[in-house]
């Protein structure tokens, strides 16, 4: 048994406790409160003058998919052979022995969402995981799988500039993405009709399976969310148009210029993972990055989660969150 005493305890869901007590048994929080008796024989940590929080959660990372050291051999997050790869699964790229996992734990982060990068318009599924376990099966949190999609500079740079093929423009991004979703919708309809036919015709032959379309079908049926990478305000609105057109359950990733259209996003009850806040203007679509963005979005009614979009850099999640609070995000919403 471990007892943390005298610290300022941020319970997140039940207010803040000054000089609170946290009891931990076998790696799990057993009790949190003000006047909790300390069991005999418990190891006691005096946290006077310090803040105590639950394990932090990074809502968007690439931890252990883009491994460390950051060399080609460990780079498994972007399958840049086709802009539409919904059948890829982040769990097949994750390295539970990535040394960056231990680095991230030192920052108080115990859970991350990780998965494919943003080179492809549809990059495959990511998932949330606990930072413990020897295999991905032990680490993954069931029910957290989501489909990575991306708009903006990355897909058109990788395929248009790099491979001289579509998409080469933002128009191309939207068109190719829509086309894939429409194909998946048609595939679903065809399979449903085949199943009905099979019930009435004993010797009917089912259509050939298409793993790409099956994977996208899960998104269209709202079984899993679409997490759509978009920085610029116009890309954010394109993501919303397409998501609404196909009735997707979606989250906007990054939402860098979201503050420019915060009222529109708030009215739609958009959910966004915002960040990283500690980034440079390395691309044109990052030109108007603002530390005030998370606070403006949260106050407008957007559901905001802070993200680091990193690997080992995820250890600095508390710093990103602190910057958001300094620039106007309410502390309770930031945590």
Predicted regions and their residues:
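Divalent metal-coordination and catalytic microenvironments
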Residues: 7, 22, 27, 49, ...
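Polyanionic/metal-chelating signatures
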Residues: 100, 105-250
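His/Asp/Glu-enriched, well-ordered alpha-helical/loop segment
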Residues: 68-69, 75-81, 85-88, 225, ...
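A general structural motif
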Residues: 208-209, 228-232, 254-256, 282-291
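Hydrophobic faces of well-ordered beta-strands that scaffold small-molecule active sites
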Residues: 55-59, 112-114, 147, 226-228, ...
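Histidine-rich, glycine-flanked metal-binding segment
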Residues: 9, 13-53, 70
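Active-site gating loops and adjacent loop-to-helix segments of metal-dependent hydrolytic enzymes
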Residues: 67-94, 135, 150, 155-162, ...
């Amino acid at each position: 048994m471990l007892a943390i005493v005298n610290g300022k305890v941020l319970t997140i869901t039940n207010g803040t406790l000054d000089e609170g007590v946290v009891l931990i048994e076998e790696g799990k929080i057993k009790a949190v409160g003000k006047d909790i008796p300390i069991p005999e024989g418990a190891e006691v940590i005096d946290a006077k003058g310090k803040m105590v929080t639950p394990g932090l959660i990074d809502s968007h990372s690439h931890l252990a998919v883009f491994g460390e050291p950051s060399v080609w051999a460990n780079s498994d997050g972007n399958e840049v052979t086709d802009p539409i790869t919904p059948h890829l699964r982040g769990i097949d790229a994750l390295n539970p022995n990535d040394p960056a996992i231990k680095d991230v734990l030192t920052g108080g982060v115990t859970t991350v969402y990780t998965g494919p990068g943003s080179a492809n318009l549809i990059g495959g599924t990511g998932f949330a995981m606990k930072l413990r376990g020897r295999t991905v099966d032990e680490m993954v949190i069931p029910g957290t799988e989501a489909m990575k999609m991306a708009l903006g500079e990355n897909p058109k740079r990788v395929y248009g500039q790099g491979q001289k093929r579509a998409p080469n423009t933002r128009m191309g991004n939207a068109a190719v993405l829509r086309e894939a979703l429409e194909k998946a919708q048609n595939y679903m309809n065809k399979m449903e009709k085949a199943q009905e036919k099979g019930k009435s015709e004993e010797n009917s032959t089912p259509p050939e399976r298409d793993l790409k379309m099956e994977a996208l079908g899960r998104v269209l049926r709202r079984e899993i969310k679409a997490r759509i990478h978009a920085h610029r305000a116009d890309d954010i609105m394109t993501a919303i148009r397409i998501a609404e057109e196909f009735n997707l359950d979606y989250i906007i990733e990054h939402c860098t210029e979201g503050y420019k259209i915060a009222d529109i996003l708030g009215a739609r009850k958009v959910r966004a993972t915002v960040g990283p806040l500690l980034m440079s203007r390395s691309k044109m679509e990052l030109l108007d990055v603002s530390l005030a963005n998370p606070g403006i979005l949260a106050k407008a009614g957007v559901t905001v989660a802070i993200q680091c979009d990193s690997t080992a850099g995820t250890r600095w999640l508390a710093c990103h969150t602190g910057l958001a609070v300094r620039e106007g995000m309410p502390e309770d919403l930031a945590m």
